[in-house]
């Protein structure tokens, strides 16, 4: 394949797999494409990496669990029933040369506005809903990139499936904090009917690596200071 040829030609030490169909795009694709990208490709790539002595870092999602209240531990059995969650679950790799990180991320996009933060920024000065009972334990893309750098440098042998998680926060509170940090002038209406709780427990990863996840205020301060590139795209 072209991917295998590219890997053979470049001879990387580490491959970070960022290929995948996100949940917001699932309605515009079919199940075959979702399974090919989210389920099959990670295992094909992991096999190439294992044979070539290349480390692979792969991303899974909190959506391998249903949004039922309760803390989800890495030892718990995933129970997703939707195409996205199932396709990502099937794509989790666990080889001696790979690490799968279950997490969720918020950050900027180069194109479009499907993600939570990009959507909120695109709504500047308008009224939006804030979901009090949608509980989130993801990370900013800024912070995740720093963790990946540390994993590459300080934990070259770490393999397996782990969960990265921040302190739980409601989508209402998260959007409110983003509104304050970026001065979006949003009017946020409290919405309480929708319920979704995919709280991940990241204790095992934090204890193993001594990598602590900052508070949301600290992550958002860092995020707010990194806007100039995206504002000029």
Give names to the regions the model predicted.
Residues 18-19, 56-62, 101-103:
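SDR active-site strand-loop-helix element
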Residues 1-37:
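NAD(P)H-binding glycine-rich loop region in Rossmannoid oxidoreductase-like domains
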Residues 29-44, 78, 82, 86-89:
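Glycine-rich NAD(P)-binding loop of the Rossmann-fold in SDR/ketoreductase-type enzymes
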Residues 43-79:
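Conserved Rossmann-fold NAD(P)-dependent oxidoreductase catalytic core, especially the SDR/UDP-sugar
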Residues 81, 93-136, 140-150:
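NAD(P)-dependent short-chain dehydrogenase/reductase
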Residues 214-233:
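Amphipathic terminal alpha-helices
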Residues 145-150, 154-196, 200-202, 231-232:
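Mid/C-terminal beta-alpha module of Rossmann-like enzyme folds, strongest
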């Amino acid at each position: 394949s072209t991917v295998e040829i590219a890997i053979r030609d470049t001879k990387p030490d580490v491959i970070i797999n960022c290929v995948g169909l996100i949940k917001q795009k699932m309605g515009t694709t079919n199940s075959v494409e979702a399974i090919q990208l989210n389920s099959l490709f990670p295992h094909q790539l992991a096999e190439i990496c294992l044979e070539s002595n290349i480390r692979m870092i792969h991303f899974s999602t909190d959506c391998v669990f249903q949004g039922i209240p309760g803390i989800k531990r890495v030892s718990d059995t995933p129970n997703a029933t939707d195409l996205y969650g199932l396709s990502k679950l099937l794509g989790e790799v666990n080889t001696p040369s790979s690490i799968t990180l279950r997490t969720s991320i918020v950050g900027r996009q180069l194109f479009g506005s499907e993600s939570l933060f990009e959507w909120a920024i695109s709504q500047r000065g308008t009224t939006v809903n804030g979901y009090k009972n949608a509980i989130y334990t993801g990370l900013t893309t800024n912070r995740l990139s720093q963790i990946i750098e540390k994993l590459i440098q300080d934990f070259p042998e770490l393999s397996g499936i782990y969960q990265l998680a921040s302190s739980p926060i409601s989508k209402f509170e998260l959007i409110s904090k983003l509104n304050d940090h970026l001065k979006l002038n949003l009017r946020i209406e409290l919405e309480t009917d929708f319920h979704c709780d995919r709280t991940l427990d990241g204790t095992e990863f934090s204890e193993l690596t001594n990598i602590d996840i900052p508070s949301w205020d600290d992550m958002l301060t860092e995020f707010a200071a990194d806007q100039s590139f995206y504002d000029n795209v």
